Amino acid sequence: MKSEAKDGEEESLQTAFKKLRVDASGSIASLSVGEGASVRASVRAAVEDAKPKSACASKDSWHGSTRKSSRGAVRTQRRRRSKSPVLHPPKFIHCSTIASSSSQLKHKSQTDSPDGSSGLGISTPKEFNAGECSSSLDTNHTGAVAEPLRTSVPRLPSESKEEDSSDAPQVSQASLQANDLSDFQSVSKLNLGKPCVCIGKECQCKRWHDMEVYSFSGLQNVPPLAPERRSTLEDYSQSLHTRTLSGSPRSCSEQARVYVDDVTIEDLSGYMEYYLYIPKKMSHMAEMMYT
């Protein structure tokens, strides 16, 4: 069966080549309609083989017919069929307000130490937004932060120790200039050389106090309770107090309930709605699952 099929293919190819040889220009157009699609396909394959590879790269010129060029190449994005919103994960990037002052300071330090940025080969962008994120302050960088970074660059053993000693006053100058830096990494790098003055007691350093750190402060920032709720809670605590004064020993649950702060489920749900985006509408598939 396979050999017969091969013979048939060879015969059709041979007939196609013969017809090509007879009249290369017009024979393809004058093929009889009754010969069917198989001969036509074989003719097309033969033409493709006969042409050099560079010429047959574009299929538009086959049969001399003009084909719409690059039909499926530029394809627009199909619209999402589901109605559910696209949920992106929350980005915990803390943008500090002090970033504008530190960018001004950065320009000053860049003019003071011209070799700091060039020694590292770090690009120094000229303009900064006022609300630029403080997390990017230590990555982009220049001057004041580039100086302490320079000391951590691995040096070749051939370089002399005098260079290291000459770098030390530069670092101290940079730390003097960088009083207002607000991101954690640069401040900690500046404090690598000299230890903090207030060791063993509470830290008084202005730089550490001014630093803005991303912190989850629990439920302290929840707006205060409505007055009617507050009055009911006060009544409840007073009734608990009178009940304990009457002499009956308090149960563990009552003792625990006394110290519970004024946080209820409603507060928690409001807090969740404020910090998390929970879509109100179910997706169609979820509705179908629930019905």
Curated annotation (Swiss-Prot):
Keyword set includes Phosphoprotein: yes
Protein name: Oxidative stress-responsive serine-rich protein 1
Keyword tags: Phosphoprotein
Stored PANTHER family: OXIDATIVE STRESS-RESPONSE SERINE-RICH PROTEIN 1, OXIDATIVE STRESS-RESPONSIVE SERINE-RICH PROTEIN 1
Organism name: Bos taurus
Cystine bridges: none
Compositional bias ranges of the Polar residues kind: 132-142
One GO-annotated biological process of the protein: cellular response to hydrogen peroxide
InterPro entries (UniProt xref): DUF776
Positions of the UniProt region annotated as Disordered: 48-174
Compositionally skewed regions (Basic residues) per UniProt: 65-83
Modified residues (Phosphothreonine): T142, T232
Pfam families associated with the record: DUF776
